[in-house]
Amino acid sequence: MPSSRGFDISLRRLARRTLLYLGLPHAIFFATWLKLPFAVVLGLCLVGGIYLAMKTTQRISISFPSKWNYRFLILVSPLFALAIGIGMGQWLTPHMHYLWHNHLWQDLVRLPWPIRYEDGQMLVHPVGYFLPSAWAGKVLHPIIQVIVEFWWGIYGISLVILWMGATFPQKTYRAIGIFMLFGGVEIIGRWLLGQPLWDLSWEPLAEGQVPSMFLSVYDRFAVWPGQSLAAFFLATLLYHQWKDRLSLEICLMGWGMSFLWSWWVALGALPLLIFVVWHTATHKWSLWAVGIVSCILGIVMMAFAWPQIQNLPTAPISYFQVALWLMLLLLLPVQLLILHKIQLKENIWWIRMIGIVPAAGLLLTSAVGLNIEIVIALGAVPFFLLTYEIVDALLSIQQSKMWLQVCLNVLVLMGMVVPAYHLYRQIHLTRYPHLQVYDPNPLFSLDLSQIPVIYIIKDLPPDMDRSPYYLAPPQGIFSELLAKDLPARKKMDSEKP
């Protein structure tokens, strides 16, 4: 609550809001995609699990300094501008990857749930982030979808900022600068690996060529907000469970509900969750009950995802990528070791650097080299947890060494280059709607003048095909047993080119 010295924030209340944020899409999914008996049973499990998790959360309060009272808007404004820049709310021409989302929203708003296309394919995708806004657009009006999606995303970003403040209350600004603007980390990684930062031939703009930045991990985290939010919340809950014993039930419930947001994120977090459960679990009936509920949610979502997993398109993998896959596997035991040492709070800077440098090296190599959607999602929770520890170490080390403080500030400034460039790029594309954007992949070659500002009102261009990552044949337990039955339908006019 506000006071002359600042204000306090309750981790218990923040964890509850996070759990409700992750859980709301499940209520919509159960009510609209599943047969009534299964919807009722799973809905009761969801409500019971959330109630037990909330009830067992420790009462922990974090005191914020008084400067938070008047600098909060300064802190959140760049993040909100970045969200608008990538396409959230459709204020600007969206980032090219974000156009995939518009096909997904278009189908969710216009077609009956669960979605089956005329060729027999089903829409199989982690739809947790998309469901609240799509449901609002379906029930009310398509334009409402855009408005709800914007504020739904802004609320998620606000929770992220509050969690960062609760984790680093005295140094929130620098923490967010390192954590959220991690483009500086990737710039260093590309320099170490000898990879290019710019491609001068990819994007012709108004008068000549404006370079496009090859920052793959930034793109993936920025333009896939559902995946990023689920990974951040899950990593944060695990971090506070290990440090503060916040609530293991909250962690388990958050893990079970993250499947609908991104099943790859949930699967990648499983080794870390097992490690935290093994070291912090107590014999309570509520823990067993919440654990069973989270496993049920995970099994149902994996039944939903299984047809897509079986039919993922494959591509040849180089030896370099195989080596990076192995590095990502090594990232997990390194992270477990870091988690195991968190409680020691060793502040001798060179000892902390010995532990941080190998982890940061793995982070750089895996983040830069693994330009693969699924692998990035699998490593998202370890990525955020490693970043938590790196931020904590840097903020404690820089107090004792001036040169380390200078290096930290340079890293933050480098990180700001990346989102600033992307925001400039999207504003530029919005100012010149006649421009064409080309890419070797035909999925991204389209005339921007043919796309309306509010994409959901009209169809996307016919050459913007649906991603194969959204489609799967209607087979397996989910479509045959759990999902609602829909009558066969003809192709809708809105789906025609």
Question: Where are the model-predicted features located?
Answer:
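Transmembrane helical bundles and short interhelical boundary loops of multi-pass, membrane-embedded
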Residues: 24, 28-34, 293-497
